[in-house]
C-alpha cells in the first residue's frame, strides 16, 4: 500500500513542482532602477519651479510586456501615454503617444514635451536620475519620485 502511494504521489509532486518552477520563471521582473515614477526637473528652457508647479512626471511602473513599458505621463493638464522600449547600450525608442483632450490655459510645457518625447533615442540612469536625450543634444532630466 505504501509503495503504491509513493508511486502515485511522487510523479504528482514532480509535475506540481515543475509547474511551479515554470510559472515563476515566466514572470517578468521589474527593473527597480528604471521602472519607477520620475519627476521632470530639467527640460527645454522651462524652470524647475514651472516643472514642479505642473507636477510634471513620467510613470514607468507598469510591467514590461515583450520588452516594452507603457509610460504614463502628466505635464499639468492632460494625461498622456506612450509605449517605451529601453534597450541595452543606453538606447530607447518611444512611440507616438495618445492623450486626453482637455483645453487648459497654459499648455506650453505639455505641447513641447509631447513633440520632443518621441525624438528621444538615448537614456541613462545614474543614481536617482534618469536622462533622456536625442541625437541633437536635447535632453530631459528626471529625478526618482521616491528619492528624498
Show where each model-derived region lies.
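Sec-dependent N-terminal signal peptides
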Residues: 8-18
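Lipid interaction determinants
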Residues: 2, 10, 22-148
Amino acid at each position: 500500500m505504501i509503495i503504491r502511494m509513493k508511486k502515485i504521489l511522487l510523479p504528482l509532486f514532480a509535475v506540481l513542482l515543475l509547474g511551479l518552477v515554470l510559472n515563476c520563471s515566466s514572470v517578468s521582473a521589474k527593473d527597480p532602477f528604471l521602472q519607477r515614477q520620475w519627476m521632470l526637473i530639467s527640460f527645454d528652457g522651462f524652470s524647475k519651479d514651472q516643472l514642479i508647479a505642473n507636477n510634471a512626471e513620467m510613470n514607468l511602473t507598469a510591467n514590461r510586456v515583450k520588452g516594452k513599458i507603457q509610460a504614463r505621463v502628466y505635464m499639468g493638464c492632460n494625461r498622456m501615454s506612450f509605449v517605451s522600449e529601453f534597450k541595452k547600450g543606453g538606447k530607447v525608442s518611444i512611440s507616438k503617444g495618445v492623450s486626453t483632450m482637455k483645453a487648459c490655459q497654459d499648455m506650453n510645457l505639455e505641447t513641447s514635451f509631447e513633440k520632443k518625447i518621441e525624438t528621444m533615442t538615448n537614456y541613462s540612469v545614474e543614481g536617482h536620475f534618469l536622462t533622456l536625450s536625442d541625437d541633437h543634444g536635447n535632453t530631459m532630466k528626471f529625478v526618482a519620485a521616491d528619492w528624498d
